[in-house]
C-alpha cells in the first residue's frame, strides 16, 4: 500500500504500522535490531519512556545489542523512564561499559567521560587511565567528540591532584600555568602529560570527523605553531572550515532520534 505522507490520516496509519512491524520483528522473529527500533519508536513516537527503557534494557541484556546498552545507560544516568528517579550513575556506567565492550563508540565516550571528569557524580570513582582507554577506543571507532576531548586533555594535561578538573576540552589551544606564587608543575605531577603534538593529532582527526570545535582549535594550532609547524595558509583553511560547519549547524532543525540502532546519530 502506498502512503501519501502529506495526509495526516496516512501518516498516522503509517506510523501505527511501523509499531506493529517492530513488535513482530522483536517479539516473534527475535531480531535485536527490531527490538532496538521498537525502543526508538516507543521513545520518539509514543513518548512512552518507561516502556522504551524496558525494551532497551532487555535488548542489551538478552541480545548484547550495543546501541541498546548505550541507550539504557542514558536512561539510567538521567533517571528517565522511572517516575521520581534521580538516576543511577553506577548502573549507567555498567551499561556504557557493556556497550563499549560491544564496540559502540558513544558508549565508550560516555564510559570515559564518567571516569575522567571531576564534575561527574560521586558514585563514580575518578580513574583517568581507564577513562583514557575508553576515550581512545571511542576515537579509534571514529567518534569525533572523543577525539576532541583527547585533544583537550593533551593540550592542558591532567594533573594528579583530586581537586583538578580532569577533562579540558578546550575551545582554544594553549597551555595552563600554575597560580602566581606556586612552583612550576613537574611531569610527575601529571597523570596525562601536556603534549601538543598528540593534541594536534587528535584535533586533526576530530576535525576530519566534522567536529567544528576541533577545526577551530586546529586553525589556532597552525597559526601559533602548536604541535605542528606554523602555517598561515592551513590556519585560514581550517578557520574557514569551522565557520562553514557553524553555518551548517545553524541551518539544522531538530529531527526525530529514530533508527539509532542502524547508525543514526543521537
Curated annotation (Swiss-Prot):
Pfam families with a match to the protein in the record: Sel1 (PF08238)
InterPro entries per the UniProt record, alphabetical: HcpB-like, Sel1-like, TPR-like_helical_dom_sf
Sel1-like repeat ranges, renumbered to this chain: 32-64, 66-104, 212-247
Keyword list, A-Z: Repeat
GO cellular component, one term: mitochondrial intermembrane space
Protein task: Required for locomotion. Probably involved in the regulation of formation/maintenance of motor neurons at presynaptic terminals at the neuromuscular junction.
Similarity section: Belongs to the hcp beta-lactamase family.
Protein name (Swiss-Prot/TrEMBL): Cytochrome c oxidase assembly factor 7 homolog
